[in-house]
């Protein structure tokens, strides 16, 4: 099929939205969800333009937003507490969307680049699979956060980089 039902962008940094302009150009996208904040890069501007032109629906989401899918799936947004104005001075990582996907009997937590300071999310509960925050940076995915989540599996999304991601301490804590 050439249709994508839904896409959510955790925050407008290029390493999180870099592939979305191509997706929007090449597929029909029903719904694009963001936290409301826009970035100041060419990639971010292109994403915003294409999302406006191509997506059937644009949603600005925050804690409490739930999307129900007909295949017994539910996407629940847990953070940020409120939507973020497009031109907000809030550092983009601090406003990263955090979403829990319940799909049949499996739960996934997507954390964007959420830093340690923002990990005190209300109503957080254990999950089966964790998408590790900020590419495994030492400034995200604290021991306390892992103790709360108790993930059975963890996924680190990272490519070649000069930051040393994933950090060895984070990898050790995931074992």
Regions found by a protein language model. Give the residues of each.
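Non-globular, low-confidence helical/coil segments that flank catalytic cores
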Residues: 1-175
């Amino acid at each position: 099929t050439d249709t994508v039902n839904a896409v959510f962008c955790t925050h407008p940094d290029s390493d999180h939205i870099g592939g979305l302009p191509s997706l929007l150009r090449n597929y029909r996208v029903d719904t694009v969800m963001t936290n409301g904040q826009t970035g100041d890069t060419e990639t971010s501007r292109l994403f915003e333009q294409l999302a406006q032109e191509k997506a059937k629906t644009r949603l600005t989401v925050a804690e409490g937003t739930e999307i129900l899918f007909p295949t017994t799936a539910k996407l629940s947004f847990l953070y940020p507490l409120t939507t973020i104005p497009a031109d907000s001075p809030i550092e983009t990582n601090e406003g990263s969307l955090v979403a829990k996907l319940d799909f049949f009997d499996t739960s996934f937590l997507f954390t964007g680049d959420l830093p340690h300071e923002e990990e005190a999310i209300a109503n957080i509960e254990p999950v089966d699979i964790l998408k590790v925050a900020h590419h495994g940076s030492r400034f995200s995915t604290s021991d306390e956060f892992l103790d709360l989540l108790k993930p059975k599996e963890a996924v680190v999304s990272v490519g070649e980089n000069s930051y040393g991601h994933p950090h060895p301490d984070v990898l050790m804590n995931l074992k």
